[in-house]
Amino acid sequence: MSFFDSVKLDLVGRLFGIRNRGLAVTCCAVAVASIIAFPYIRRDYQTFLSGGPSYAPQNIRGYLIVCVLALFRQEQKGLAIYDRLPEKRRWLPDLPPRDGPRPITTSHIIQRQRNQAPDLKFALEELKATVIPRVQARHTDLTHLSLSKFEFHAEAIFLLPSVPIDDPKNVPSHDTVRRTKREIAHMHDYHDYTLHLALAAQDGKEVVSKGWGQRHPLAGPGVPGPPTEWTFIYAPRNEEELAVVEMIIEASIGYMTNDPAGKTIA
């Protein structure tokens, strides 16, 4: 260490009342790292706020929560994971590939879409507060509407409390249903019009492989988050894409309610 470095450390020690030279070095390193990292942290915090309302409060406390949870982030687009899951039935037909590249999504575990937004007129007339209620209305014997357990500002489709899930013979997706607290699907129609929903493994594989969505960043085995089947669906941009998205919601309801229309695949 040079004479000048030694003098600097002595000054830092005197300034903060630190007598231990090693502690002074550590404090200097932390201070320099904080100064360097501050612009990134500030941008990252703004990105977190831009994601809109979610389960994490939109303040420093919420930001710290998502930063800690990000330590458990999982890969979101691989397909091999689906073949390891026991459910082999499908409720979706073969889907057409989604037009264009995948949208850019947020780097945070609060999953949002950052580009390819639907036209505002289409969103307000065809998506906002209409998609989830419209699909649920076809399944009132097994489902009901309530606020999401994951996104406290979103209306969600739930399996009725009267439907038993303790016996695997009644609902083969019983573990998934339990982990989502009976929630089947919700749309972020207060923000970017994306959705989260639970899909049977082979339906999830179809959705991800055709570019219609990806898994939740905390969805995976051994992770303290939603089940592997919890899937993020990109916002529909037109009537054709909306029709596909509604089919995906229908498939989610079919899986979570054990609709016998599910087809076993080889």
From Swiss-Prot:
InterPro entries reported in the protein's UniProt record: Luciferase, Luciferase_dom
Keywords linked to the UniProt accession: Membrane, Oxidoreductase, Transmembrane, Transmembrane helix
Main location: membrane
Membrane spanning residue stretches: 22-41
A GO CC term assigned to this protein in UniProt: membrane
Practical applications: The availability of a complete eukaryotic luciferin biosynthesis pathway provides several applications in biomedicine and bioengineering.
Entry's localization field: Membrane
GO molecular function: oxidoreductase activity
EC number: 1.-.-.-
Top-level taxon in the UniProt lineage: Eukaryota
Membrane disposition: Single-pass membrane protein
Catalyzed reactions: 3-hydroxyhispidin + O2 = (E)-caffeoylpyruvate + hnu + CO2; 3-hydroxyhispidin + O2 = 4-[(E)-2-(3,4-dihydroxyphenyl)ethenyl]-1,7-dihydroxy-2,3,5-trioxabicyclo[2.2.2]oct-7-en-6-one
Family: Belongs to the fungal luciferase family.
Function: Luciferase; part of the gene cluster that mediates the fungal bioluminescence cycle. Uses the fungal luciferin 3-hydroxyhispidin as a substrate to produce an endoperoxide as a high-energy intermediate with decomposition that yields oxyluciferin (also known as caffeoylpyruvate) and light emission. The fungal bioluminescence cycle begins with the hispidin synthetase that catalyzes the formation of hispidin which is further hydroxylated by the hispidin-3-hydroxylase, yielding the fungal luciferin 3-hydroxyhispidin.
Protein name: Luciferase
Protein's organism: Armillaria mellea (Honey mushroom)
Gene: luz
